[in-house]
Amino acid sequence: MIESFMGYLPNSHLSMAKNPNLNEGFSALAGTIFGSKHLNMDLINLIALASSLSSGCKYCQAHTSHGANRAGVSPGKIAEILKYEESDQFSLSEKAALDLAFSAGLTPNASKKEHFAELQNHYSDEAIIDIVAVIALFGFLNRWNDTLGS
């Protein structure tokens, strides 16, 4: 299933497969998060990329930029994600989500109440939970892949 979704089988899944319960649980969680009814696939992939850029995980940066491209995110957006605040490629709602993703992807976490106040201007409570879920999922993957050297 993951191969058909991503176009390849990630090394992280190969290592997780050594613990079938972990692999099954992770796959269910990732499927739920990527199947959000409140966020479009472009935004999910941009949040994943921003969070991975912020954490410094090169493996996840490569895979999330590939995922964004496969989801149809414009090459211009992918190229300008580090300059999203000044770029006219991103909507105000995308900028609010990316503000949180870049801040929450840091260690220690740099998210603030102001991030959530701005998100409230653009998203429902359910969508905000889904934004945080994407960031948290990639927090796990960033640590997993950097630790195992995927």
Regions found by a protein language model. Give the residues of each.
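Hydrophobic alpha-helical segments
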Residues: M1-S150
